[in-house]
Swiss-Prot record:
Lineage: Bacteria, Pseudomonadati, Campylobacterota, Epsilonproteobacteria, Campylobacterales
Entry similarity comment: Belongs to the aspartokinase family.
GO cellular component: cytosol
Enzyme class: transferase
Name of the featured protein: Aspartokinase
Native organism: Helicobacter pylori (strain J99 / ATCC 700824) (Campylobacter pylori J99)
Pfam families (UniProt xref): AA_kinase, ACT, ACT_9
């Protein structure tokens, strides 16, 4: 049985921990499994390399930065490979390019287009443990690209799909997926199994266990995911289609989890010319810069003008400013607020229950937490609030929906 295992930066965070990962991998091998391992850079290494690159340019070339940053995963994959060989098993490290991962040419945020698995398959047949540098690949010209923050999860899922692996195990420093972040709410409960759709909402709304792009890809490729703690042997959380749940689930809970995302910024455009097509032009320009826009509120003003508010990822503020430059003459003012957070309530049970939003709004009002913006989908409700109330809001909502029981 072929298994893909991914180990994050915390799991690979020291020499001792890399040795521990090697032992964990060998446990699977001793059970008769073929194992492909995907690794992140050691904890803190990506940030260190980013800061290193910024010493040479105020506006670093993205191609060159990808070459610098990708070195972190090269080092950790080679280190783990050597540790595995020390313990008596054949192992080899491969860069994303060497592993056959073909991507688009969008440096720092590339998209995986295909994977040629021939070399990996040949190595597995020769009884190698294949250790692959996550977070990276190469475009059609052979240029090194990176997949964006958290891209090692994406590497692992894509490889699991391409190799038709039985399972993709994501190892982190937590026991699995929780009803909310246990570091915020100590009464958070581990979820034994969760659907792709619920996990996708939690991931896209700020849950830290998995990158939302990796959940989307797992659903598309029908890759069975398990998130586990690399520091113990707990069962973890199984993430599959609802039809593949193990055993019988009791009636679906109304709310499955509460997610918090502090990496948000609010863009407020006041006095925008109110004419047909202006919104399409603005959001089209943002799309050209590959800026992810989330919550959107438009307020109809007077005298042929309107106000437009929306949220973006905080790290994309500079790109947003560049994209909106051509529109500055068509508005009165623009403001960027980084002191906000998005709190989301997620659950497939919300489809068949009314009053879920009302419960949340009343609970937040009782704690004097003002809601700036609201967005909803079939299985989630998100609110934008002042960042200083973020953790209080999470604890309040976790309690009001009885997720601590």
């Amino acid at each position: 049985m072929l298994i893909v295992q991914k180990y994050g930066g915390t799991s690979m965070g020291s020499i001792e921990r890399i040795h521990n990962v090697a032992q964990r991998v060998l446990e699977s091998v001793k059970l008769g499994h073929q194992v492909v391992v995907v690794v992140s850079a050691m904890s803190g290494e990506t940030d260190r390399l980013l800061e290193f690159g910024k010493n040479f340019s105020h506006n670093p070339n993205k191609r060159e930065m990808d070459r610098i940053v990708s070195a972190g995963e090269w080092i950790s994959s080679a280190a783990l490979s050597m540790a595995l060989e020390r313990y008596g098993h054949r192992a080899i490290s491969l860069s994303g390019k060497e592993a056959g991962i073909l991507t688009s040419s969008h440096f720092q945020n590339a998209v995986i287009q295909s994977i040629d698995t021939q070399r990996i398959t040949e190595l597995l047949e020769k009884n190698y443990i294949v250790v692959i540098a996550g977070f990276q690949g190469a475009d059609i010209q052979g240029e090194t690209t990176t997949l964006g923050r958290g891209g090692s999860d994406l590497s692992a899922v894509a490889l699991a799909g391409a190799l038709k692996a039985h399972l993709c195990e994501i190892y982190t420093d937590v026991d699995g997926v929780y009803t909310t972040d246990p570091r915020i709410e100590e009464k958070a409960q581990k979820i034994a199994q969760i659907s792709y759709d619920e996990m996708l909402e939690l991931a896209s709304m700020g849950a830290k266990v998995l990158l939302n792009r990796s959940v989307e890809l797992a659903k598309k490729l029908s890759v069975k995911l398990v998130t586990r703690n690399s520091f113990n042997h707990s069962e973890g959380t199984l993430i599959v289609a609802e039809k593949d749940f193990k055993g019988e689930r009791m009636e679906t809970p109304i709310v499955s989890g509460i997610a918090l995302d502090k990496n948000q910024a609010r863009v407020s455009m006041e006095g925008v010319e109110d004419r047909p097509g202006i919104a399409a032009e603005i959001f089209g320009a943002l799309a050209e810069y590959r800026i992810n826009v989330d919550m959107i509120v438009q307020t109809i003003g007077r005298d042929g003008k309107t106000d437009l508010d929306f949220t973006i990822v905080k790290t994309q503020i500079e790109e947003t400013k560049q994209a909106l430059k051509p529109f500055l003459a068509q508005m009165d003012s623009i403001d960027y607020d980084e002191n906000i957070a998005k709190v989301s309530i997620v659950g497939v049970g919300m489809k068949s229950h009314s009053g879920v939003a009302s419960i949340a709004f009343k609970a937040l009002a009782k704690d004097n937490i003002n809601i700036m913006m609201i967005s909803t989908s079939e299985i989630k409700i998100s609110v934008l609030i002042d960042i200083k109330y973020a953790e209080l809001a999470v604890r309040t909502l976790h309690a009001v929906y009885q997720l601590d029981q």
